[in-house]
Amino acid sequence: MKYDFTSIIDRHGKDAIAVDGLVPGGHGPQPPKEGFDIIPMWVADMNFPTVPTITQAIAQRIQHPFFGYFATSDDYYNAIIHWQEQRNGVTGLTKECIGYENGVLGGVISALNVLCSKGDNVLLHSPTYIGFTGCLTNNGYHIVHSPLVKDEAGIYRMDFADMEKKIVENSIHATVFCSPHNPCGRVWERWELEKAMELFQKHDVMVVCDEIWSDIILEGHKHIPMQSISEDARQRTVALYAPSKTFNLAGLIGSYHIIYNKALRDRVDKESSLSHYNSLNVLSMHALVGAYTQEGSDWVDELRQTITGNVDYACGFIAQHFPGVKVQKPQGTYMLFLDCTEWCEAHGKTIDQVQQAGWDVGVAWQDGRAFHGPCHIRMNLALPLSRVQEAFDRLQKYVFVD
């Protein structure tokens, strides 16, 4: 490979919550037992150095020693338009349809504030991304869950009958849709998106679609933008994207929405700007321009190969060595969602005991209950393969033991 996905780089002391936040009273329990270092497999950021064109773009801008008020450049909009066309096959996108958001979750709330009244019911699938739960609840919206169901092959699917029942019974007119799905890793097929949009059109449900993971699609799968499904979907959907998940730029802040419906776009733009808080950072702008290049695209292709290899290794190891631990092999994202129900029942353990046993040996994974997985654990695989292998060796020796 041209790019570095194998080096183990110490992130301690560099402000990364993935490692520096794991202190008592912070994001983790007690430190691991003596002799075990921390393998960060919880929060969804990556342990790979980002593509060099990003650091080069930022370094070049820093050479100009002025950081005052600025205007968003055409380079920024053109980079997004080109990226969406190259990676997702999007055509007809213009700069007028693109709007800055500090974060995807902030964009979700700006859209819902336009589409709903406080106290309204909003449809979400479960398992559910923890960020949706917090921001919707904190902003006065009531979440109605439609659980995903597993088919005969163990693949999570939407339950369209349940979705329609929940929409009708709860007078729902807005949904927050996750594509690809976090934490389950589903990359929705076109027929699934078409059927969902038919349902939303039938019952006049507006769609806020989080597509932040859309670049991290594993080999053999393809992301389909929700707005590409039909002209109605194009007009009904607020789509949210960011380079942050793709290139590990969460610390720089910077997302964007794509809205084709002018009346809706004007209202969301106004809502997003009311507090004067939602404004682009000049270095984030240059980071996106540096990311959305041909070199950035090449880097993402190698990242996808790396994550696919890590997923293949982890799922194969689980199937061979952890009987009773169930996992649907993700089709996108770099997260695993482990169902430990059968293993815990067979061994007389609680999910708390399993999680603590992992933390004790430095496997810093995440409680799946916050994602509506009652006996689940979420694991980040965006690490060098050697670290993934070390983590699963520890789990075999010290956690999932008879």
PLM features per residue range, with description:
Residues 211-213, 242-243:
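Short strand-turn motif at the edge of the Rossmann-like AdoMet-binding core
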Residues 236-320, 326-330:
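PLP-dependent aminotransferase class I/II
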Residues 124, 145, 209, 365-367:
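Hydrophobic residues in well-ordered beta-strands that form the structural core
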Residues 346-350, 356-366, 370-402:
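PLP-dependent enzyme catalytic core of the Aspartate aminotransferase-like
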